[in-house]
Amino acid sequence: MADYTNPIPAGNAPGTSAVVRNTDYGREYYGEQAFWKMQTGFLDALFGFTRQENLVLITVLKNIHPRTNTYDGTIKGLARRADVDEKTVRSALLKMQEKNILAPVAPGQWMLNPRLLAKGSFLQEVKLMATYDTCQGKKVHGATVIDDKTGELVTLPNEYATVEQFYEAQAAERFVKLYRDFFSAISGLSETELKILVYILQAMDLGKNMYIGTLEKIKVHCGCSTATVSRAMTQFVNRNLMVKEFDGCWRIN
């Protein structure tokens, strides 16, 4: 995690600022086993995409540049990558913007909301948050800190009006590790299948990576038939998302 030195020596920056030591997580984030820092709002954002639109969403997520949280590519190129038509790409991108998953940066470039998924140190994450807010046309006027790694004067997102709020948020940071294989595992799932999967993930025991509950319980919550739930669970097992330990007990991968 990042650590901090406060205050800055006189004359180096405004007195309301602090020097922030930007400690990178290194290979843990950027190596072959890199994981995303996921907030639970990401799972809710997966709802509402058709099977074809889901392919577009997953293609974007799998090709995000982690240091900038951006996807670069044309509509035509994204359609080719996702193996869908351009109309589907436009529809999916519009939904992603409406759901606050993406914000347009420039023609052919979109930014992934770092409040849903991000990599790197806490300071790097909040820098991305400020950039994302700017992409949405918001005026960023949070506290100011200095990144001691780059010497950059950083204006924080508006939720950090004081340096103390920034410290407190860093100390209380919580997230779920999300590995890249998850994107491939959910690629092409239907809207109903995603709804079932998200319910299971949100209801599981995080300490044991286990969901306990009957198919009937899932059916009632998700508003579908028992047969639909059963088919979805088979899909999840085949995609290596979970295994069945015994009736009503599923171990999440």
Over which residues does each language-model region extend?
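Short recognition helix of helix-turn-helix/winged-helix DNA-binding domains
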Residues: 1-73, 128-138, 143-209, 216
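Winged helix-turn-helix DNA-binding recognition segment
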Residues: 47-52, 63-119, 191-192, 203-253
